[in-house]
Amino acid sequence: MKMNLEKLGERIIEGGDILVEEALELANLRGSALYPLFGAASRIKEHFVGDKVFLCSIVNAKSGRCPENCSFCAQSAHHKTDAPVYSLIDEERMVACAREAEKNGSSCYGIITSGTSIKKGEELERICNAVRRIRRETGITPSCSLGIINHETASALVEAGVETYHHNLETSRSFFPNVCTTHDYEEDVNTVRVAKKAGLKVCCGGIFGLGESVAQRIEMAYTLRELDVDSVPLNFLNPIAGTKLENAENITPMECLQTIALFRLILPTKRISICGGREKNLRDLQSWIFFAGASGTMIGNYLTTTGRAAEEDWQMLKDLNLSVASCCE
């Protein structure tokens, strides 16, 4: 398998693709057989996206009361959790959080809102005004994640200065009905297409540990490749009390790393960032993500869970002798 991986890595670097059957075979690797896979993923990453690390941060700009019933989400109105509930924060707070993210070393800053979609009118206008100020007053690049959007909303975001729209598929098409039944998978796919058509870059990934099979993780990766998204955030479930998945078992650190490596082989040219749940699932192996094909990570807090201190992540990067990208392009 080592020689096969070397040849597969060379094929991908030369512009070839990994076949679904090959990805499924690599998903069966265990133990020390994973190390050549990580090596191949790391070489592919360095060839296509370089060795600098991309850092991003987010603000939970509107929390709770979401009508969707996503099984993992603490903000769903269908669950009883301790997640905070509040309406859209004011413009000043969005800008202040952008400054804090920039201070912590992030080059990208996402404004995230709960709910199926953002309300047109005052809410969208407030976000657009904040984006304009962030553009003027900071050096950080703003992005938005406002749920399902149409062309009108996408165009308004472009006009305000948003470069990237974030919208996760969460899981594969075949597993999605087990995760959410309040909207259709195709609505999420269409949002990605709407954003791209409007001229936005798209950040789109998912979350692992929902009960999906390894084959379904690979299925999602190929869907992302078909959609030609620009960057791929990978999350690992951190079970929240009160949600349907509160008793779900965490994925093992090596399984997390194997998943990252497979996504790198399937999506060789994309920025792959490791976000929510990395502390809980990867534990002492968090630093290994960069040797398994990841090219970025989220620092600071997540939507409803706490991340580790930015200083710890910076120390990790220093210990690894990795430099940080100065922009999120």
UniProtKB/Swiss-Prot annotation:
Pfam family, any one: BATS
Occurrences of domain Radical SAM core (ranges): 48-278
Catalysed transformations (reactions): (4R,5S)-dethiobiotin + (sulfur carrier)-SH + 2 reduced [2Fe-2S]-[ferredoxin] + 2 S-adenosyl-L-methionine = (sulfur carrier)-H + biotin + 2 5'-deoxyadenosine + 2 L-methionine + 2 oxidized [2Fe-2S]-[ferredoxin]
CDD domains: Radical_SAM
Single GO BP term: biotin biosynthetic process
Pathway assigned in UniProt: Cofactor biosynthesis; biotin biosynthesis; biotin from 7,8-diaminononanoate: step 2/2
Residues involved in [2Fe-2S] cluster binding: 143, 203
Record-level Gene Ontology MF annotations: 2 iron, 2 sulfur cluster binding; 4 iron, 4 sulfur cluster binding; biotin synthase activity; iron ion binding
Cofactor (UniProt): [4Fe-4S] cluster; [2Fe-2S] cluster
Keywords carried by this UniProt record: 2Fe-2S, 4Fe-4S, Biotin biosynthesis, Iron, Iron-sulfur, Metal-binding, S-adenosyl-L-methionine, Transferase
UniProt binding sites for [4Fe-4S] cluster: 66, 70, 73
PROSITE patterns cross-referenced by the UniProt entry: RADICAL_SAM
EC number from the UniProt entry: 2.8.1.6
Record's cofactor remark: Binds 1 [4Fe-4S] cluster. The cluster is coordinated with 3 cysteines and an exchangeable S-adenosyl-L-methionine.
Domain of life: Bacteria
Function (record text): Catalyzes the conversion of dethiobiotin (DTB) to biotin by the insertion of a sulfur atom into dethiobiotin via a radical-based mechanism.
Subunit structure: Homodimer.
PANTHER family the UniProt entry points to: BIOTIN SYNTHASE, BIOTIN SYNTHASE, MITOCHONDRIAL
Family indicated by similarity: Belongs to the radical SAM superfamily. Biotin synthase family.
UniProt-recorded name of the protein: Biotin synthase
